[in-house]
Amino acid sequence: MSLESYIKKYKHDNIIEILKLDKYKWNFSYLSRNPNITWDIIKENPDKPWNWSGISDNPNITWDIIKENPDKPWNWCYISWNRNITLDIIQANPDKPWNWSGISKNPNITWDIIQANPYKPWNWYFISKNPNITWDIIKENHDKHWDWSNISYNPNITWDIIKANLSEPSEAHKPWDWYFISLNPNITWDIIKENPDKPWNWLYISENPNITWDIIQANIDKPWDWRGISRNRNINWDIIKNNMDKSWCWDNLSDNPNIFELSTNKKIEIAREYFAQKRIVRHWRECISNPAYLVCQRRLIREFQELI
């Protein structure tokens, strides 16, 4: 077994053990779509109240898994935006109840695909948050029904773009949404500190992937929102275990993609254990195969006696 497989197995077993503990109030609707929850974990725990809409959205669910389990109550809206679903799969399976709102959100759907299929019932609310939509595309297509909340959150929208276009959306009566700007992955803690006059939203700042646990601890005077912190992908299980007195939101923790990720220190600890086991195995093989060792001598004598 490779080190990667060893760590993956440890993580798998660790998740199983955590799920067995009733003291944690997991929300299985959210947990079902958590990328740490694999198909094997779902199959091994049929007693859990898994949510099939969440499972349908889970990035570990492939098209092969869906095809091999047609009896499951799949949600085709969520399957439609599952990142494992490509346009080729959709076109090759026209009999399936694909959902075009879901397809509009699918990260495999590019602007070229949208342009090549103008008569499809695209949903511009979801297209606006599609990671393939750039600012140039938005500027060149003013006539489209863009959703400015989702544009504000779109990872292709940088702080420089926002600053340079603060007036343009307002004139079009489509202002930037500062709630979603607060969550935008291009917004850093330095930007927030340097712009205290902006109508930041602390729920979404608390969730912003640039906000680390160290930043939160170093700025306890800020109005952090524990619902957002609970969904922040910098929060891992070690942080939660060491801070059980905090007002964690278990619904959002269940949805946190990093919640079951192993910390670097834990991976180092597991790696040391792995290589220690390897050394023990190698040493044992040396002991039983090298006549210089007593255990090998005894083995050879025993095998010789069995032959006569």
Each language-model region and where it sits:
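Alpha-helical scaffold segments
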Residues: 1-270
